[in-house]
Swiss-Prot record:
The keyword Membrane applies. It comes from Saccharomyces cerevisiae (strain ATCC 204508 / S288c). Coiled coil: none annotated. Residues 67-77 have a biased composition (Low complexity). This is Probable phosphatase PSR2. It is found in: Cell membrane.
Amino acid sequence: MGFIANILCCSSDTSKTHRQRQPPETNHNRNRNRKHSSNKAQTQGRKQKATPNGDKMQYSTPEILLSSSDSGSNAGSKTMQENGNSGNGKLAPLSRDHSNNSYDEEKEYEDYNEGDVEMTEVNNAGEEEEEDDEAKEKQDHVVHEYNVDADRNSSINDEAPPQQGLYQVGQEDMNPQYVASSPDNDLNLIPTTEEDFSDLTHLQPDQYHAPGYDTLLPPKLQEFQQKKCLILDLDETLVHSSFKYMHSADFVLPVEIDDQVHNVYVIKRPGVDEFLNRVSQLYEVVVFTASVSRYANPLLDTLDPNGTIHHRLFREACYNYEGNYIKNLSQIGRPLSETIILDNSPASYIFHPQHAVPISSWFSDTHDNELLDIIPLLEDLSSGNVLDVGSVLDVTI
């Protein structure tokens, strides 16, 4: 540090000696300096700020050239002035003189910044107006699209709802789902005249029935004489089926449609095997589905290899009421007081809601336990002490 200090001291003495040797400025040289400095300041623009002092013209030095170790002093900052007395055009280094600076640089800087702020505010105002116009156009576009969508949805809702289920391929007989109506139209399916009620037990033209009988099922076998009848839905109640590949499928059924074989992926509802084994001990079990037999029969063969399901009824056995497939319990051939239906669609049992045990539609939830949860209720209803299941279910559910 001593060596560096000596160098700095020598540099300071040299600077002082050099300043002492400078001859005094004359009026002629001062005018030349002022003219030369004015021209130079105009070419340098904002990077150099000229002071309006008649005696000296000094230029601010960029901050990058200032020494960071000066702590506010003028060491390291230099200005250049032409030496008029020497006549050789050399520039002598001068220390920056702030005491003679009558021009308020801070004020000029503030005015300059205020001008920038005003220009920025004007630009921002213009941009905000453009953004407001764009936002208004977008809002008008969204409102227009919303109105178009609302009109489209209104027209769609006015149309008859499509049939849900597996085979939505255009063939009239290849839809395995049991009901073509939507829940919103359930109340419209209820018969309103005495003629409608009297016709519920009569078979419709081309409606399936047990051979030699005017009912859907033949008379009870001896083994079921003391048991009530439990009717089960198939799709979304016991299983879920889809044409789309499902890695969790329990089995795959090849189904022929228009001379082409399609794979149907089937997953079983959790607890379905235990459920079927238990209810087969308590009831005469009937699977009644609105699906076509070419799909439902092979599915039931795979689902129930042990024969726990005693009867099977398909779409052709459904009661066609205003274009909807209804499971008419009055045509089963069993006393209504001993007949229960388990179905996920209220529209399918619209004629006899007091005999129904509702269950939610199932698609893939592996944590579902509804089939097992219903077993205790069915065990109670199977008791000989229950003379009319409809009166009990009408109060219980």
